[in-house]
């Protein structure tokens, strides 16, 4: 088990990608604190993982919630080795022209409060404990941090901001604490929700036909599941194999950046020779 004896705190760990990260960390021997707004999601984790989990119901927009999560993590497990900032919201590809004038400020504030400020607050709260453990922080980005079209104008701007945050924190905290990011593409089974300010709070990205949308444009030929993405979070949290790794963002999106102009990939031609 690659995380035996390690302790992590995962924000947004009650569903979707966050839940897959928590499940995988526990399977790899870690003990995990989870900050999530869903009491039901936290209870499901507790029933499944028992004493390996500490659940904290709270709001990632609140520094007090983050501080409570860190305090309860350290109280239960004695330390904090790895912060995983993962909680987020989506804008359902909403273009600037489609955001009403009277809602644009509110929508901007909601997006950046959760997707950017939420990470900054998590980092602020976790810093003393991470300094003591000489640990690391991992932040979920998105392929929207690299390319247009993975979200609308608000989501894409926010994810680009997160990449800047990762690089700046890696600079400010090195060499005591490593800071990195992971940028998934479309995630099958994700429960990422929309902005309340745009009346999208009851929509989930899981309703999108992601596999049909992505299989023709990704060199891998399909979208990946949350469980398939979770392994990268294990690697980034390990100590022995990641000593030189800080300020990096893994573009972990099925090869979107290497697709061709006319075809996503040419691997099918290999079948003519070797199939």
From Swiss-Prot:
Pathway: Xenobiotic degradation; toluene degradation. The keyword NAD applies. GO terms for biological process: toluene catabolic process. The active site is at 155 (proton acceptor). It holds the Pfam family adh_short. Its EC number is 1.3.1.-. Keywords: Aromatic hydrocarbons catabolism, NAD, Oxidoreductase. PANTHER family: 5-KETO-D-GLUCONATE 5-REDUCTASE, ALCOHOL DEHYDROGENASE, PUTATIVE (AFU_ORTHOLOGUE AFUA_3G03445)-RELATED. NCBIfam families: BphB_TodD (TIGR03325), PRK06200.1 (NF004849). This is Cis-toluene dihydrodiol dehydrogenase. It comes from Pseudomonas putida (strain ATCC 700007 / DSM 6899 / JCM 31910 / BCRC 17059 / LMG 24140 / F1). The gene is todD.
